[in-house]
From Swiss-Prot:
Chain segments carrying region Disordered: 32-61, 93-113
Annotated function: Neurotrophic factor that enhances survival and morphological differentiation of dopaminergic neurons and increases their high-affinity dopamine uptake. Acts by binding to its coreceptor, GFRA1, leading to autophosphorylation and activation of the RET receptor.
Tissue: From stage 22, expressed in somites and the pronephros. At stage 24 and 26, expressed in the pharyngeal arches I-III. At stage 31, expression in the eye, central nervous system and pharyngeal arches IV and V increases. Up to stage 34, expression becomes intense at the oral cavity and lateral line structures. At this stage, expression weakens in the pharyngeal arches, and increases in the epibranchial arches. Expressed in the digestive tract in stage 34 embryos.
Listed GO CC annotations: extracellular region; extracellular space
Gene responsible for this protein: gdnf
UniProt protein name: Glial cell line-derived neurotrophic factor
Entry-linked PANTHER family: GDNF SUBFAMILY OF TGF-BETA FAMILY (PTHR12173), GLIAL CELL LINE-DERIVED NEUROTROPHIC FACTOR (PTHR12173:SF1)
Origin organism lineage: Eukaryota, Metazoa, Chordata, Craniata, Vertebrata
UniProt-listed Gene3D superfamilies: Cystine-knot cytokines (2.10.90.10)
Amino acid sequence: MKLWAILAVCILLLSSVSSIPLPSNWLAGKKRSHLPDPQEGEDQVFGMDGAVPEDPTANMAPQDQQTYTEIPDDYPDQFDDVLEFIQDTIKRLKRSSNKQPPSRRDRGRQSLAANTQISSKKTVKDRKRKNKGCVLREIHLNVTDLGLGYETKEELKFRYCSGSCNNPETTYDQILKNLTIRKKLVNDKVKQACCRPIAFDDDLSFLDDNLVYHTLKQHSAKKCGCI
């Protein structure tokens, strides 16, 4: 429900309640018209001398008498309910005004920040893809799986180099590539750089199934490069 509609409902309720005027001595007459406490006895109901209590409208003006008869008994309760409803509505309006939606400028800033974050993540991913040329990989194997003729239950982490070396690593590689493209080195076959180990792990020593001691050297890569 919109704010202007809520305000209109509050105004209508307040005007409907306030449209019934209160007479000047209505409250006094209302108090006199209440029944007395049962503990005070029957004498207080009919008066000490047996006379009938005074009519609360006796001292009212004619227009007040007519208004008094038209006012419902629960008029004050209805009025309090309407006032309480209006107060709750005003509090709700204040809370809703404090939660205003972001302006167009704020939405633009949020969108710009989100786009910047997405672009930065994309740039990092692109860099990782470009640098995935020659990389060091690892696999868990048994020594027997190496195919070197050893029968043993010993295991190891075999590291190897994988990837391409299309991007020249040095100026020398760039020159060789340019000369090959321009066919300046027709008689000589120049090999392209390949991804190979430039450093190896430490030696691996183990016992085979016949309890014979063996040592493997330069068996696993430690660092890779295009050479």
